[in-house]
From Swiss-Prot:
Belongs to the TatB family. The Tat system comprises two distinct complexes: a TatABC complex, containing multiple copies of TatA, TatB and TatC subunits, and a separate TatA complex, containing only TatA subunits. Substrates initially bind to the TatABC complex, which probably triggers association of the separate TatA complex to form the active translocon. InterPro entries: TatA/B/E, TatB. The gene is tatB. GO terms for biological process: protein transport by the Tat complex. It comes from the Bacteria. This is Sec-independent protein translocase protein TatB. It comes from Albidiferax ferrireducens (strain ATCC BAA-621 / DSM 15236 / T118).
Length: 154
């Protein structure tokens, strides 16, 4: 942009005050300000338009590269599918030529799980044993003595 310092602006303002006069100077400054604002907006719009067109060109190039990559991938998939179908046809033709063996695997033998269903049905539930005071765990003699020994009073 134009390099105008404060001293140059003061000199231009002084000359404009002498030439135009103090009555018309504020109106002239206002018009110059609006014209400069319009010029800046116009330049910014032109820059934006140029940037947009450049971005569109880049996007078109990217689109073309992606489309070519998709075409290449599609072609490779088609060729691999054709190769696979050819190999499959060859393999099935060879398998059809070989005699068929009468091999039938024996089914697995049934093994009973050995669950003690009747014992479980006849068993008394633990919650009932706890309520009735039935002992479910055996204590050793030493453990029983230690459990029922009276506490020492200090």
């Amino acid at each position: 942009m134009i390099d105008i310092g404060i001293t140059k602006l003061a000199i231009i303002g002084g000359i404009a005050l002498i030439v135009i006069g103090p009555e018309k100077l504020p109106g002239l400054a206002k018009t110059i300000g609006t014209l400069l604002g319009r010029a800046r907006r116009y330049v910014a719009d032109v820059k934006d338009e140029v940037n947009r067109s450049m971005d569109l060109d880049e996007l078109k190039k990217m689109k073309d590269t992606v489309e070519s990559a998709v075409r290449d991938v599609d072609n490779t998939i088609q060729t691999s599918a054709a190769d696979f179908e050819k190999n499959w046809a060859d393999a099935t033709a060879q398998a059809a030529d070989t005699p068929f063996n009468d091999f039938s695997p024996t089914p697995p033998a049934y093994r009973h799980p050995n669950k003690k269903w009747r014992v479980k049905q006849g068993a008394t539930p633990n919650w009932y044993k706890a309520r009735a005071g039935i002992r479910t765990r055996a204590l050793s003699g030493a453990a029983r003595v230690a459990r029922f020994r009276p506490h020492k009073v200090n």
